[in-house]
């Protein structure tokens, strides 16, 4: 780890900075596209896979072992518990934490913030991972670090193991980035579907 990078990947990327999906995850990659089109996207930045890889460095072996597990049994639960404990309680690399806190301060604006998972595999061609990961909404700036920990920890939940089993996935565990974004103030909000999400 050197400066504000991990294996060449910057810890933080801002909305106006182009970055590959492997660095920022599916959600942030789509937000980049909307931002480039000039859409009115609330300001955001992403804690990249470089940052989360650095955080997860002490449990890299457990993550590789969990990726080989097919069932949610005592073995996979043990791996997941050690990973989650590391995320929730360990001291992060100082440069990662400093980069996050500095970016939260720069985001400013006084609006509540959203903390949203952005997996590299999320919303991809081979799978959506819809509903597998976590978001935390309406947060003050001083709650962001704890929310990042919870969103990252949720990436190793039983439902993710089950989703991978159902899809026959045996490869590397999904890599997570985390989006931190200003929340929009609206009078009316909704979601439009181009197809029935239950039947396609």
Predicted regions located by residue number:
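Contiguous beta-strand/loop segments that form the cofactor/metal-binding neighborhood of enzyme cores
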Residues: 180, 193
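N-terminal beta-alpha lobe that positions the nucleotide/phosphoryl donor
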Residues: 1-179, 188
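Phosphate/diphosphate-binding loops
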Residues: 186-192
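Short intrinsically disordered coil segments
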Residues: 130, 194-197
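Short, flexible loop/turn elements at secondary-structure junctions
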Residues: 119, 182-184, 197
